Design a protein with these regions (language model features):
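TPR-repeat structural position
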Residues: 73-74, 107, 111, 118, ...
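Canonical tetratricopeptide repeat
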Residues: 96, 141, 187, 221, ...
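Single-residue signature of alpha-solenoid repeat helices
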Residues: 76, 114, 121, 160, ...
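Helix-start (N-cap) detector for alpha-helical repeat units in TPR-like alpha-solenoids
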Residues: 57-58, 91-92, 136-140, 182-183, ...
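Alpha-helical segment of the N-proximal tetratricopeptide repeat
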Residues: 55-86, 103-114, 187, 194, ...
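Residue-level recognition of tetratricopeptide repeat
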Residues: 65, 99, 103-106, 144, ...
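Structural marker of alpha-solenoid helical repeat scaffolds
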Residues: 86, 131, 177, 211, ...
């Protein structure tokens, strides 16, 4: 007997489906196509980091200009350095970097810092002219950088004259390429005043003002010409005009304040001169406030305040301002020297020894805190020991050496009576002529 197989009760017999096969083929072909597109870069894989757009030279330059106007010159320099990194063949960018580097040297304290920054400015301007030898703006900026390098605190008289000669040639070349270049006219006037060609300098800067009186540089240089000619009130007026254009450029406030202080010196009675001194302090205080607002720790305004109070005979507040400057730059040997001078003038001779020693010979550990006017270091209060490298002697720092030697000699500060120690004191007192006393008393 034949028995038929039983049909499955709960499962279907497997069978092929043409639609399912077609779907698999489409998916496989689609996957192959996607892999090919990914290899070509047409399609990006999922979950990749969001691409960051590449910044342009113009973007960095705009950032640099904004930082310059805000008074943040170091940030402006960094932005322009990024700009020339992105496009190293842009002559205008190199020239603008050189201009900011030159101005930024005015915010530095020590001669080596200033010299290094100014040499960087020359390098940037050289690069600009190398890229665009017939660009009037590049030659004008190079004249500016060369003129500010012509400083007898850095170089010999012969070297200074060489810098001034080269600066004059660059300014004339800029005017030859574009006789309507207002900046070139202004920088040429600045070179001429440094060459003591006063009448010619005044003619050129007035011509620059007639062409364009909207430039900070033009008013700054006119103020410089006027103060060199002893017209301090008019110089202050021009600095005020420059400040109106660049209100966060604290260097201008310091120059205007210094002119008020110079006017005060011409008044024989200190009390009669006090209102003029107070005007100078107003400018310095504004510079301090601007630096606080933009987060810049610049010792310059505090040192200007200290000099003003020192001239008024108010040595305690003068010393406090120098100590504030040292909080910003605790390893700056020049600031220790300025504190030592104030202690000396206030007859705190013992205190002046510690500060002047740090300035001249250098100091470290507890001595560095004593050099800042402290009894000892107080790490809990942020008064930590630092290493201070002594300064080399230079024409505008010789006062530190002179006074240090005088105090050591007067107080018999040798800890022993050895011939070597006594001989050292004698060398200190013989090293400087007597006429220096009256000169350094101011």
């Amino acid at each position: 007997m034949n028995v038929s197989p039983r049909r499955p009760l709960f499962s279907r017999k497997p069978q092929s489906n043409i639609y399912r096969m077609f779907l698999w083929v489409v998916m496989i072909l689609g996957g192959i196509w996607m892999l090919q597109q990914m290899n070509k870069g047409e399609i990006q894989p999922l979950f990749l980091p969001t691409p960051t757009p590449t910044r342009t030279t113009e973007s960095y330059a705009l950032e640099g200009d904004a930082n310059f106007s805000a008074g943040k010159l170091d940030a402006a320099i960094n932005a322009y350095r990024e700009a020339v990194r992105v496009d190293p063949n842009n002559a205008q960018t190199w020239a603008k970097l050189a201009r900011i580097q030159t101005y930024s040297s005015a915010f530095l304290i020590t001669n080596p810092e200033k010299k290094t920054r100014l040499l960087e400015a020359i390098e940037s301007s050289d690069r600009a002219i190398e890229l665009a030898p017939d660009d009037s703006f590049a030659h004008a900026i190079r004249a500016f950088a060369l003129d500010w390098n012509a400083n007898e605190n850095f170089y010999t008289t012969e070297e200074v004259q060489n810098y001034l000669r080269d600066a004059e040639q660059e300014a004339l070349r800029a005017l030859q390429l574009d006789n309507s270049n207002t900046l070139a006219l202004a920088f040429y006037a600045e070179v001429l005043i440094d060459q003591q060609k006063w009448n010619q300098a005044e003619q050129n800067i007035k011509q620059a003002l007639a062409q364009d009186d909207s430039l900070m540089d033009v008013h700054r240089i006119y103020a410089y010409v006027l103060e060199t000619l002893g017209q301090y009130n008019l110089a202050i007026s021009e600095y005020d005009k420059a400040i109106a254009i660049e209100p966060n450029f604290t260097f201008l406030y310091l120059r205007a304040g210094a002119n008020y202080r110079r006017l005060a010196l011409e008044i024989p009675n200190v009390e009669a001169a006090r209102p003029v001194y107070e005007k100078s302090l107003e400018y310095f205080d504004r510079a301090v406030d601007i630096n606080k607002q933009i987060g810049v720790k610049d010792p310059g305004p505090h040192l200007s305040i200290a000099r003003t109070y020192s001239q008024l005979g108010e040595f305690f507040i003068a010393a406090r301002n120098v100590q504030t400057a040292l909080e910003y730059q605790p390893t700056n040997a020049d600031i220790y020297g300025q504190l030592g001078i104030i202690y000396f003038r206030s007859r705190n001779y013992e205190g002046s020894i510690f500060s002047l020693k740090c300035s001249i010979r250098g100091c470290s550990g507890e001595e560095s805190c004593q050099g800042r006017g402290l009894e000892r270091c107080f790490p809990d209060l942020g008064e930590n020991p630092v290493d201070v490298e002594g300064m080399a002697i230079s024409p505008n720092k010789i006062v530190y050496y002179y006074i240090y030697g005088s105090v050591l000699s007067a107080l018999r500060y040798c800890r022993n009576t050895s011939p070597a120690c006594i001989s050292r004191e004698a060398r200190w007192t013989r090293s400087f002529p007597d006429w220096s006393r009256s000169r350094f008393a101011h």
